[in-house]
Every structure is written in C-alpha cells, then in structure tokens.
Amino acid sequence: MKKFIETIKNIFKIEELRKRIVYTLLLLLVYRLGSFVVLPGIDPTQLGKLQSQASEGLLALLNMFSGGAFGNASIFALGVMPYISASIVIQLLGIMVPYFQKLQREGESGRRKMNQWTRYLTIVILVLQGPAYMANLHAQLPESAFLFHGFSYNIFATIVLIGGTMFIMWLGERITDRGLGNGISLIIMVGIVARLPFAIVSEAGARLSQSAGGGVLMLIVELVVLFFVFVATIALVQGTRKIPVQYAKRIIGNKQYGGVRQYIPLKVNAAGVMPIIFAQAIMMFPLLLSGFNATRGLAATLSNSTGFWYNLLYGLMVIAFTYFYTAVTVNPTNMAEDMKKNGGFIPGIKPGKKTAEYLDSIMSRITLPGSFFLAIVAILPAFAKMLGISNQFASFFGGTTLLILVGVILDTLQQIESHLLMRHYDGLMKTGRLKGRSGM
C-alpha cells in the first residue's frame, strides 16, 4: 500500500503527465456538464416519459453511451454512436474499395484523409438521425413541453444536435492529442461510469424492498457474479499466446547483439471491443430507421435485446466481426517479413512464407475460442435481464459496457505506466509492465 501511494505521488511529480491528466479531466468535465444542457425550446421538467423510454431495450444502451444525454434531451443526445458507425463503414471500405486501400498505405497523410472521410460520413448520419430523434421527442413528450413549434424549430434543433456531436468529437481529438488515453473511448467510459452508481442504487433498492425476503442475499450473489465476470473479462483482454523467437548473434564493435530468445505476444482477443461495437451498431439500424420507436414487425424483433433472434444474430455477428477485425489488425505476412529483416526466426519454422503461414494458423486457433467467449460476454446482459436483474444494472454484466470499462482503464494505466518507466520511476505493477488492448 505504501508503494502504491508513493507511485501516485510520482505521477504528479512528472509535470507533463500532471498537465495531461488535468487537461483530460477538465475536458471530460465539460462533456459531463454538456450532457445536462437541454435542447433550447424544451421544458426540462416534462422529460419523464422520454427518460422512461431511454431505460429500456437498446435505447438504454444508447442512453448509457451518451452518458444519459439521450434521456435528458440534451444537446449531446446523439452522442458518439454516429461517429463510431461512420468509422465502421470507412474501415470496411478500407478493405473493399481500392481508393481507401491506397489511403491506408499512405501512412500519416492517408490516415488524415481517412479521418476526414469519417467526419463527412458522420455528418451524413447525423443529418438522418437528428430529425429521427426530434420525431421521437414529439412522440414521447406532450406538446406543452415544447416552447417552439413547427418545421423551422425542428431544423434548428437538428443543427444543435449535429453541433453537439461534432463538439464531442472535437473534445475526443483534443484528449487524444494533448491529454491521456484515447479521447472517444474515455468519453464513452465516463458516460458508462456516470450511470453505474444509479444502477447499483436502483438494483439495491429493488432487492431490499422485496416482501418475500432473500433480497439481500440475491444482491450479494449478483455483486459476486459481477466481480467474477469482471475478472474473466480482464483475462480475455489480457490473454496472450507467446510465440518464441530466436535472433541470430551479431557482433557490432566489441559488443554482441542477439542470440537470445524473445517472444511475440499474440492476443487471444486482438480485436478488442470493436466486434461488439460493430455488431451493436448494425443491430441499432432497425431502431434508428423506425425513429427510435420500434413497436412491431421486424424492427421490434431485432430491437428486443432479450429476444432469441436478437441474441442469436448478435452473437453470430460478434464472432464474424472478431475474425474480420483480427484479420484487419494482425498481418502475419508483415510480422514474418519484419522478423526476417531483423535476423529473427521461430525455432523449427523456416523464415518468410512458412513463418507467415505458421503465425496465421496460430491466430486462427486462438481467435476461435476468443470469439466465442467474446460472444458470450456480449449476450450476458440479456441473460441477466431474464433472471430479473434491472435493465440498468444488467448492462454491467458484460457486453460493450464491461469491455469498454476494462479496456479503457487498462489502456490509460498503460500510458501512465509508460510515463513513469520512461522517467525511471516504479510502475503501477510489480513487473513494470501493464498490457493494454487494441485501440477503439
């Protein structure tokens, strides 16, 4: 404990790290305050029905991603999901369309162009979602809740919603560039964490008020299960398969280099949280197309987060996207070529093509159980709801919520660890190494 306190003190001794932490916290505070700023022209005292709607089904997830802004009719109500959806589409185009494939190979300049295309597509999605959100507001709120009416007000409110999401994107970029961690990921995480106390209090209140008794025991069981799910999720995020690599001995001057065995850590879940986000973004399309108010037909079936068909399709998409995103982020051919250039080889495997094939086969084998476990984590909240756990609390039993929390926390701690070790301070872990996960 004493060493941990000393490490915390060391964090604030490093001026650059201290400034980055303060800058990040200030921008996250701006985001949280903005989540409570209601759209101009709406009476904030009449949002009860909207908040009730935003606590059920897929809308509860959308509300959580926006930090409660969706249910507050806030200027940030559309959150970052349009940006995430646009990122998904652009990444898919980077595989299928030659122009975007070329941009991916152009390094930093290509990345900037890809980001620009992502922003353009985000605006297109916002132009579609803004009116849909306003239509939902008119359906859920009484006419007296609106101080202004008519087409011109809806246009004005849509522009404000678009501006709100663009401002969130700007905050995320500033945090990534000048703060600590991935900005968009931290913004999503803050929205999730902000809902956790309410979810726990709500579940505790429901259990303690049970007249039949046993509520306290059930609450304890739920918290214990949540703890073990959290630990299992950390194991999934951190799990690696170490591939031994031998480097040839080289003598430069009077010093000998190489000749020692090292390891390539291949992640069991190289795709991180992206497969679940991809799958959820697609599963939300029917809900978005129905104006956030799917009550019957195919849209209702595919929006029922506890339904059989929803979870079957959701789980299959998570597995498919895990393979897809792993193939995008892990390139065995490049790994084999880099290894060969540096005089490295896997014992018993020929350098070059054979090494690439070996790495590809290993990735395929470890991705299979990783994808199935990721799918189980994704649908765990649905099972929790079926067992009578409240919608808000059940969302923390797995899925995007838990993976984002674990992943973002580990990534941020890894950055802090790097700053400490670079300046010869003890890290946060005894080993001095804290593994993160793939960026979001």
Per-range role (PLM):
Residues 1-104, 109-440:
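N-terminal cationic and glycine-rich segments that engage phosphates or anionic surfaces
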